[in-house]
A protein has these predicted regions:
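Basic, glycine/lysine-rich polyanion-binding surfaces/domains
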Residues: 1-193
């Protein structure tokens, strides 16, 4: 197991959209979608580069985040400004965090009422909840299965958590969650790719 760590993730391209034709619009652009609400998948970029994390937030809303060096979201985002019928952009300027290492479940138990240790990770769950009073989106991933994340932050087979929140709450969430990580023997580091 690797050491407990919370890392604030660097800026990545993100895209949010919703509406009755949002899924159709994404599929037409080669994006692979999760079939079930509140689940995630990875979609390979069309140029064979990195991957895009695609989270389905309910039936008709999606959150996408690209690897640091990705180009797909930058290329397709401008077409959302064309007032498409049934496809509505959602501003995503989230602050992102990566929590990994031995003791993550103990940290999460102190800051959130969701029992993350009991989740079935094979279903690729997406959790929308409160963490230290802040609305967050959480994607648990198994280290060996991660693609498109910050490589090397967690060991193979370890459960790691991607966490996003409104950018105005990013500093507070980082400092507060970082303090709990430190109390549990881990470290909080600044920005990573």
């Amino acid at each position: 197991m690797s050491a407990l760590a919370l890392t604030r993730c660097g800026q990545r391209d993100r895209l949010g959209l919703k509406g009755p034709r949002a899924a159709e619009w994404l599929v037409a652009r080669g994006i692979v979608l999760p079939t079930a609400p509140n689940s995630w998948t990875h979609s390979q970029e069309s140029d064979g580069g990195g991957s895009i994390l695609v989270a389905r937030l309910g039936q008709v809303e999606f959150f996408l985040e690209e690897q640091a060096d990705g180009t797909t979201l930058k290329a397709i985002a401008p077409s959302l400004n064309q007032r498409l019928q049934g496809v509505y952009p959602v501003l995503r300027e989230d602050s992102g965090f990566h929590l990994s290492g031995e003791g993550t479940d103990a940290v999460l138990a102190q800051v959130c009422n969701v029992n993350f240790a009991a989740l079935t990770l094979d279903s690729h769950p997406v959790i929308m909840t409160l963490m230290i009073g802040v609305a967050v989106l959480v994607v648990p991933q198994v280290g060996a299965a991660r693609r498109g994340g910050a490589a090397g932050l967690g060991g193979a087979g370890e459960v790691e958590y991607r966490i996003w929140c409104d950018p105005t709450f990013g500093p507070y969430l980082g400092e507060s969650l970082g303090a709990v990580v430190s109390e549990c023997g881990g470290r909080y580091t600044g920005v990573s790719g």
